[in-house]
Amino acid sequence: MVERLSPLEPDFHPGSHGNFEHGVDVILTETRPGSIVQLAAWPGEEKKLIAAIRAVTGLALPDGAGGGISSGGKSVFGFAPGKFTVADDAEGLAEAFAKAVGPAIGTVTDLSHGRTVIRIAGPKAEWVLAKFFAIDFALPAFPVGSGRSTAHHDVFAQIHRSGTDQFDIHVFRSFARSFWKALCHASEEVGYEVQ
Amino acid sequence: MLITCPYCGPRDVIEFTYQGDGNRERPEPASQNFEAWNAYVYDRLNPAGDHNEIWQHSGGCRSHLRVVRNTLTHEISSVAFARGDHGPRRKMEGKS
Ligand SMILES: [Zn+2]
């Protein structure tokens, strides 16, 4: 298998940065999932697609807009009506979904090499992200497991809350380094560690 | 100005793209009715008040939306999926 190169590499500097004298308040990392796919159901076929997601990943999507769940290295969340992003630490999701989602149900798009997933975790993760995105990061409005589609200066972002203080941000690979640098600058104030 | 996307909830107008007057009726593509085409391209109601508009949540879920906006106050009195009801909706406090 060809080794995948990170687009962040020239600006990815492990270690502590910014105002970390009193400790680091966020940890930045790249999650590098083996597969990322986008699934879209034709209108009226959403339930069949959700059943296919369950059959392939074992994940049961909760009801509601932006609902999602993570377990066992896999995650899924809704990002638009009838549309879902699925990520897996392992490779091969697109092939599995191509078998499970027929053309009468919807579409499968392999984005494994097209997206970069940046994780921000820690007590100030909400604080730092609130500098970028005009959405409500409070837990009742943005529960663990769910996803949000939004944008920062035309850099489209899908944000998946993978923990109480942890967010996985899916950005276009070609914008990832620029977004990463901005995220590092925004994290200097609170002290950050790149892992 | 905030637009409450039926899927994403309230978002800043910067996430949306205006797609034009929602009152227009596009003639059939093969239509030779030039008056109808002229009306589709040029005629606008230009009301001082509630106006039917098409917006896209281009910086979010990318749904096309049917929005009623007051041209005097910018108050938005209704937002719906342009293609009719589909998919789950976000639960709004005090609103359905
Ligand atoms: Zn939306």
Identify the residue ranges that each predicted region occupies.
Chain A
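Basic, glycine/lysine-rich polyanion-binding surfaces/domains
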Residues: M1-Q195
